[in-house]
Amino acid sequence: MPTPTPPIYFGGASPAAEAIAAEHVDVYLAWGEPPTMVAERIERMRELAAAKGRALTYGIRFHVITRSTSAEAWAIANDMLAHMTPEAIAEAQTDFSTTMSEGQRRMAELHAGDTAKLEVHPNVWAGIGLVRGGAGTALVGSYEEVAERISEYHELGFDEFILSGYPHLEEAYWFGEGVLPILRDQGLVEGATNQPANISTFR
């Protein structure tokens, strides 16, 4: 065994996955859902883990679209939506409707394929999930708004944030330049600098 032992990250929304996580993993992961939905999951996982004499750390997965203004960020999200044809959306949603994945079912239910109901919580956009399987929500907004949403999810109990974007490099730049300084000033990020690093840990 390596020393120190690397933490085990694991995600799954089914009862079977939750039982495995409660007994074996270090960090339980959830896809980005509205706060009320993920708060219920954290509470359930805390109870399951406590029954095993354990306590878990919690992480959440989002895409990010952030710019200096909210209007700029939403313009990018809307442009992405404009490139999703009705046929592509319908095909993807049909595929998702037959999945055995509980997490995928929950993602699809956020919008039910309706392009008019994609902001499922302030700054939480489910548009990516119209055509993409897996994590289908993005934090969309100004630097301040995205930082506020991260703070909100942190207060629910999430200490790990697994973030990505389209394109990855460019969105990492905007997040690093605009959002990280705010989170650092709020004391929510340890070890975050403007220099490349292997990991940044949220408190």
Go through each PLM region and give its residues:
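A local structural motif
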Residues: 3-7
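Hydrophobic faces of well-ordered beta-strands that scaffold small-molecule active sites
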Residues: 8-11, 26-30, 56-63, 161-164
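Alpha-helical segments flanking ligand/cofactor-binding loops in enzyme cores
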Residues: 18-22, 151
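Structural motif
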Residues: 23-24, 156-157
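Glycine-rich, proline-tolerant flexible connector loops at the mouths of alpha/beta enzymes
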Residues: 32-36, 160-176
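An alpha-helical appendage that flanks or caps ligand/catalytic pockets
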Residues: 33-155, 184-203
